[in-house]
Amino acid sequence: MNNIIDGKALANEILADLKLEIQELKSQTNTSPKLAIVLVGDNPASIIYVKNKIKNAHKIGIDTLLVNLSTTIHTDDLISKINELNLDNEISGIIVQLPLPSSIDKNKILSAVSPSKDIDGFHPLNVGYLHSGISQGFIPCTALGCLAVIKKYEPNLTGKNVVIIGRSNIVGKPLSALLLKEDCSVTICHSKSQNLSSITSKADIVVAAIGSPLKFTTEYFDPESIVIDVGINRISGNKIIGDVDFENVKSKVKYITPVPGGIGPMTIAFLLKNTVKAFKDSYSTVCHSCL
């Protein structure tokens, strides 16, 4: 169906542009962006995600460093390792693969990453920039991917009613800030919201991001709505499904993203785009400091 949004194709366009940009940057600087990925433990899903990030990074000319640590590591020791990466001038961007073991203080770890290398956009300083409307720092990649998809299919967002189901720091909160900047009327709902279908069925755009498999069926959506499914739910081994009942909903809405193949590839594309931005920012800083 031509109303199914091909996130992989959109992501490939971004990656192709990034590859050319990296080639140009390398010719100018004789160096390449480098992404450090901190992986604690051996969570199977995390390992898959990390391998995918590394594969896509290498495809477009971004070097990578995988720092794989034991689940027994203490918060302070992990912070020390992150500080080493912060001080390494060869490292452009740093991501800490989530989730972390429960024994580790996640907030302390995310705050330990230098804001200038925080390409996930999770450091409190970068969060503050976004919610203050300051065009500086980094924005969470999934939120950027969602916005790019939405704007591709609805270029004029002024006055559009958008419902975001989910209030996470990764999707719901940052995406709401981005959409407010686009002059949308944004409603944030969550798993405790009442009469949810009566809210979502009036929306022009619905973003589902609560991690509840196939929860949202046809009665949740207006026939002219755009549906963005950010849910990633693993069932029956490695099979992944979204929060939206895709098979039944896809013919009942204007546009819809599938899972997999929708927002996932866009998230990786914007992660790498942020890596290139961090590289350019750091190189610009070095050049200016030499003047």
Swiss-Prot record:
Protein's UniProt keywords contain Amino-acid biosynthesis: yes
Catalytic activity: (6R)-5,10-methylene-5,6,7,8-tetrahydrofolate + NADP(+) = (6R)-5,10-methenyltetrahydrofolate + NADPH; (6R)-5,10-methenyltetrahydrofolate + H2O = (6R)-10-formyltetrahydrofolate + H(+)
Any one Pfam family match given in the protein's UniProt record, by short name: THF_DHG_CYH
Amino-acid biosynthesis is among the record's keywords: yes
GO CC annotation terms, alphabetical: cytosol
Assigned EC number: 1.5.1.5, 3.5.4.9
An MF annotation (GO) of this entry: methenyltetrahydrofolate cyclohydrolase activity
UniProt family annotation: Belongs to the tetrahydrofolate dehydrogenase/cyclohydrolase family.
Main function: Catalyzes the oxidation of 5,10-methylenetetrahydrofolate to 5,10-methenyltetrahydrofolate and then the hydrolysis of 5,10-methenyltetrahydrofolate to 10-formyltetrahydrofolate.
Protein name: Bifunctional protein FolD
Organism expressing this protein natively: Rickettsia felis (strain ATCC VR-1525 / URRWXCal2)
Gene name for this UniProt entry: folD
